[in-house]
Amino acid sequence: MGNIVAIVGRPNVGKSTFFNRLIQRREAIIDSVSGVTRDRHYGKSDWNGKKFSLIDTGGYVKGSDDIFEAEIDKQVELAIDEADAIIFIVDVESGVTSMDEEVANLLRRVNKPVLLAVNKVDNNKRLANAVEFYSLGLGEYFPIASTNGSGTGDLLDALIEALPEIEEEDESELPRFAVVGRPNAGKSSFINALIGEDRYIVTDIAGTTRDSIDTRYNRFGFEFNLVDTAGIRRKSKVKENLEFYSVMRSVRAIENCDVCLVVLDATRGFDGQVQNIFWLAQRNHKGIVILVNKWDLVDKETNTMKEYEAMIRREIEPFTDVPIVFISVLTKQRVFKAIETAVKVFESRSKKIKTRQFNDVMLPIIERNPPPAYKGKYVKIKFCMQLPTPHPQFAFFCNLPQYVRDPYKRFLENKLRQEFDFQGVPISIFFRKK
């Protein structure tokens, strides 16, 4: 898992423009994850070979442009707690404002790398004016212009130099199942229901990520780590920024796990915040199991469960091949079924299909249902294979890969899932020139 870098600053200084500038740079960004919020506020980055996750905290600030300083302070405090480094963006046009000084006061008190970026420096006059930001007491500043990218390379070079080293994960480590979801959905209670009276627990160890607890657990003859990141922070610090807090915690948990157990509160439904976490897990290619908790509190009729499940699948389209387990941590209803399902998803995600077997199954399907002609030309797929990657990826070799349209790609994915059982596992399909 890479470091987390938070972009902070008051409204209208160019945080989102700076973020968008970075995620459009192919040499810097290896993947941009949409769906974390309605706008794109989360990206996985790689600058000069160093990976980190970039979060634009500006997207989590509520209210109008003249938002209260107290709310800005809470947002910045959360970023300080969760991030490994912070980029503080100010606006040379406005000069040093009282809100800038308030944020700087917070940042000076932390023992983490803080990089001061003076934005909108696009001419020599503004370059000279940027000197006044020395008064914030944060040391060297970096003049940048988010609109054209000027200065961002120097800033990123300094960021990489400042980021703490993170030990690479040992591939021989036990599988990690992360319990994620919005606050108060029952994440910690779910783990407590599993371990409270269970004699299969081996030990509790400090997690590799800050504030997480890894519980080494053995069930169904399968040993793994349960990762709980919930209920650790003081509620008084997060009650005004629950969505920001939840996503920040989920980023760490999801990037460092194999399977995500996404817990939702049955009385609240599959809301936007749960959807954000679901898409975050999907775009990180993690196995996914959805747990509908507090099912004992829902008034039920004959088809209540079926209708609730259908509602969830509509919300997560087009990736609907995900197991959904209805549980109650209070009564321990189906809590072990949830773990059994997560183990199956992990095994599916780790599955390796032999090339000959894969071709024997898929090529006859393709022959019966070939890709539609495009611009009068026919695509002929002659060979396919699973790629040697940590999560399932498949390559189909053909004469005209550029002419394969998305509907046919979805058709192949559906057939793959039917034939090889990849429930709960995001898969990637590529078409390559033979």
From Swiss-Prot:
One of its GO terms (biological process) is ribosome biogenesis. GTP 1 binds at residues 9-16, 56-60, 119-122. It comes from Christiangramia forsetii (strain DSM 17595 / CGMCC 1.15422 / KT0803). Keywords: GTP-binding, Nucleotide-binding, Repeat, Ribosome biogenesis. Signal peptide: none annotated. NCBIfam families: GTPase_EngA, small_GTP. The keyword Nucleotide-binding applies. Belongs to the TRAFAC class TrmE-Era-EngA-EngB-Septin-like GTPase superfamily. EngA (Der) GTPase family. This is GTPase Der. GO terms for molecular function: GTP binding; ribosome binding.
